[in-house]
C-alpha cells in the first residue's frame, strides 16, 4: 500500500468510524459530517446520507452501511446509489456497524439515534436474497462484527 500518513493525519473527522482496508487503500466514514475519507487523497466525498460503516468493496464500488440502508458508491465517479433500503424502517434508529459475510449476507447492528445510552438496539442478519432476520434485540450500541 502506498500510503502517506502525514496526508491522512490532515483529514479531520468529527466522528470517524467504519474503517475498511481493501488491500490498497484505507477508507473510513465521518458520521457527523456525512463524509467518506480515504488514504487515496483523491477520494474524499460528501454524501447525501449519514454513513456508518464501509462494509466492503466489490467491483470497484464501496458498499456503505448508512442510516437509510446500504449504498453503493463509485470512488471513480462518486456516483451514490442505494442498493438496499428499509432493512429496519424506523426514523428513531440507524445502522451503526456491520459486515459482509463470506456467503454474501450481512450482519448489521442498529442503535437508537438519540438516546442510545438508555434504549437498546438490535442485530439483524440479511441474506443474499434480502430476507431479514432479527438475531438479538438486547444491545445498546452493536459494534465490531468479524467473521
Task: Give the label of every model feature segment.
Residues 11-24, 48-61, 65, 89-105, ...:
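Beta-rich, blade/repeat-based domains predominating
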Residues 1-12, 39-43, 82-87:
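A short helix->beta-strand "capping" segment at the edge of beta-propeller domains
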Residues 39-42, 74-78, 126-130:
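Short loop/turn segments that connect beta-strands within beta-propeller blades
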Residues 62-101, 110-117:
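Glycine/small-residue-rich loop that forms an oxyanion/phosphate-binding "nest" at active or ligand-binding sites
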